[in-house]
């Protein structure tokens, strides 16, 4: 955003066209809060940091994919439950589009049956669960609100760290995000 604005573009000319890709993992409550925090932070950044006036610039548009890394080969049918919970967290967090992994992807390419179940998972959530009837079904939940606030605070601190390095381009030049990705990958393993 900063580079585009420095080049003379108006934030409201490009921000409404930006979209993002997220992954959703197994911690249901944390994942819902993550998406809610992302939406709040995006609106804040667009309004307060970049001065966006168009309400569409304040809206975070994002696609979500369930986390293939969470799928297990030993009992692949249990992955149906994992994917369902992840998909539900994404929907309750406000995703605009969703990809649900097939339960057998830990073993290789998905079978036709597994792909059909992944599709039916989305259809049941959208058409039978009732959660899509609400804009923010979990808004007001103490647990969700507290987690959302914690995530917003941590992300704000992280953004401040990047700003202190001179912005994202400078941070990349210094290897900061690369080191962070390596560190988190090591911790995850």
How would you name each of these model-derived features?
Residues 1-6, 31-45, 78-84:
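Active-site cavity-forming subdomains of large catalytic enzyme subunits
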Residues 34-35, 76-77, 102, 112-114, ...:
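Composition- and surface-driven signal marking solvent-exposed, interaction-prone regions
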Residues 41, 87, 120-124:
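Generic recognition of well-ordered alpha-helical segments
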Residues 71, 77-86, 96, 185-189:
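Non-catalytic terminal/interface segments that mediate subunit docking, oligomerization
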Residues 111-112, 120-123, 127-189:
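Flexible, glycine-rich loop/tail regions that form catalytic "lids" or insertion modules at the edges
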